[in-house]
Each structure stands twice: as structure tokens, then as C-alpha cells.
Amino acid sequence: MSATLQKLAELTGSSLIGDSTLTICSVANLNHATPRDLVFCEDEKYLGDAFASPAAAIVVGEFAASAHDAPKPLLISTQPRLAFAKAAKVLRSHKKRSGGIVHPTAVVPPTVVFGAEVVVGAYVVLGEHVHIGDRVCIGAGVCIGSDVKIGTDCEIHSRVTIYHGTHIGNHVIIHAGAVLGSDGFGYVRDKLTGRYHQMPQIGHLIVGDHVDIGANVTIDRGGLEDTVIGAGTKLDNLVHIGHNVRIGENVVIAAQTGISGSCTIGAGSIIGGQVGMGDHATLEEGTILGGQSGILSEKIFREKGPCFGTPAKPLKQYLREQAALSRLSRRSE
């Protein structure tokens, strides 16, 4: 999809210097830009390179607000990276569908309710009483259990499995291979026989609006309560979230992180890759955990600022301890 610079300025909340009628077809980096592309320059020291590139126009910060004689049109934003992301989303969007399509190989019971312009791919299997909102796109081989509710404008990519009773909000993206709402890891040990017995998982999974779920993510349904993923949260590939976990709004979790059952993660938290959280742990709002950090079971973590290590601690303390260990090891040589 293409758009004029004037349209992109309006959609991104940017001010415009230069030809407002210029049509932009795509986005690119400086090294691969063409005369039809929009590029991004967040640092003033690279502005000369951006001007020298073949790009049609540049998204820049306020440092270029007075560059009225610039050789290329400029979109000027207080948050240029965000403006570029919004422009990229507009330019990569596809033309809206004029109608829904259900592939003839899909299994669709008569109790399924479709909104407008829903697309259902090949070999999709839908359970009884599934409700699917307007403009939802379901990829090939998706399996959706009974009583699932999906909001509007969602993208569900191929081979996703959504277990019964799961509720998914609006504008949610679920990438290939994700499994949502499976049974949690809940077992009770018989002390006499040593045998483990499953605790029935009767809760549900609730996913808020504007959540992105990466490939091969697994999220368990609740045991007695619901598992909740807050609006605006982004989950990278291969993240696991256990039963009864409650994640606040706008949380970011990187790949290979494991969240044990009944954890609570406050809104706005940032969690790096390969982080591990023990069961019933709590992260307060705005927590920042670096990669491979560990949170002990039942810990209430209140530290502010970047934290690293196992158990996790403030970055300055972590670095001091690492330096001390290094000095000790050299003394013993």
C-alpha cells in the first residue's frame, strides 16, 4: 500500500517539511533505500548519510525542525522511531477485504458465529459455539476449541491451537505454533504411593486487546482462577506462561522466558530473554529484568531500574559482585 507524505504526517502525528503530495510506497534502511522509500534517522550525525541516500523522504527527530532547505522531504517527530513504526505499519497493510472467505476444507459447526469479512484458511477446525469477530484472519491448520471468543481485527497464523473457553480481545496477533489455554502444570502427590494426580484445570485464559503472541508461545489456562494477559502486552517466541499468571498492561517479555504458575507481573515491566520466575512471585510495576535473571518463588520484587542475576538484583550491585568474584579468582591462581 502507498500513501502520500501528507497522509503519513497525519497518521504519525508528525510535522512535514517538503512536498506533501509525494507518494511513499515502502520503508527501508539507509543501505537499501530506493527512490520510493521512507527511511529513519534518529541521530543528527547520520542526517548527512540520509540526505545522500536514494530515499524519497526521511523521518527525523526535532533536531531537524529548522531544516527548511533540506534536500529531501522530512517528517519531524518528537518520537521518530515510533513515527517510523506507524508509517511502516500503514505502508505494509493490505487492501481491506470486501468479503469473508471460508476454505472448503475447514470444519465449521453450525453453532459458530462469524463477524463480517472473516477469512478461514485450509484445514481449520472450529469447535462448537465459537464466536469470531469482524475482519479476523485465521491461517491454515488452526484448531480452535469450543466456546472460544475472538474479538475484531485479529490475525491467527497457521498451526495455532486455542483450547476451549479462551477469550481473545481485539487487534491480537498470534504467530504460528502458539498453544493457548492448555492445562496448567498442576499435580498433587499421593504421599503413600508417590504417584502424582492431576488437579483439574477449570479456569480460562483471557487475552486483552492489542496483544502480540510470538511463535511457539505456550500459555496455560487457569487452575481455579483465570490466566490473564493484559492489554498491549508483547510476548516473544518460545515464552511459556503457567497457570493463574496475571500479567499487567504493556508488558514486554523476550524469548525463552518461563513464568511459573500464579506469578503476577506489574504493568509496564520489561523482561529479557531466558528469565525464570518461580511460582507465586510478584514483579511490581515497571520492573526491568535483564536476560537470564532469576526470581525466586514467592518473592515480591520491588527493585526499580535494570536488574540482573540469580537471584535478581540491581545492575550496579550485580556488577560489583561480578568484579569482586573476578578479583577473588585471580588471587587464588
Swiss-Prot record:
Protein name, as recorded: UDP-3-O-acylglucosamine N-acyltransferase 2
Q: Where is the active site?
A: 243
Q: What is its EC number?
A: 2.3.1.191
Gene expressing this chain: lpxD2
Q: Which GO terms describe its biological process?
A: lipid A biosynthetic process
UniProt KW keywords? Acyltransferase, Lipid A biosynthesis, Lipid biosynthesis, Lipid metabolism, Repeat, Transferase
Assembly: Homotrimer.
Q: In which pathway does it act?
A: Bacterial outer membrane biogenesis; LPS lipid A biosynthesis
This chain's function reads: Catalyzes the N-acylation of UDP-3-O-acylglucosamine using 3-hydroxyacyl-ACP as the acyl donor. Is involved in the biosynthesis of lipid A, a phosphorylated glycolipid that anchors the lipopolysaccharide to the outer membrane of the cell.
Q: Which family does it belong to?
A: Belongs to the transferase hexapeptide repeat family. LpxD subfamily.
Signal peptide start and end residues: none
> Which GO CC annotations does the UniProt entry carry?
membrane
Task: Name the CDD domains for this protein.
Answer: LbH_LpxD (cd03352)
User: Which reactions does this protein catalyse?
Assistant: a UDP-3-O-[(3R)-3-hydroxyacyl]-alpha-D-glucosamine + a (3R)-hydroxyacyl-[ACP] = a UDP-2-N,3-O-bis[(3R)-3-hydroxyacyl]-alpha-D-glucosamine + holo-[ACP] + H(+)
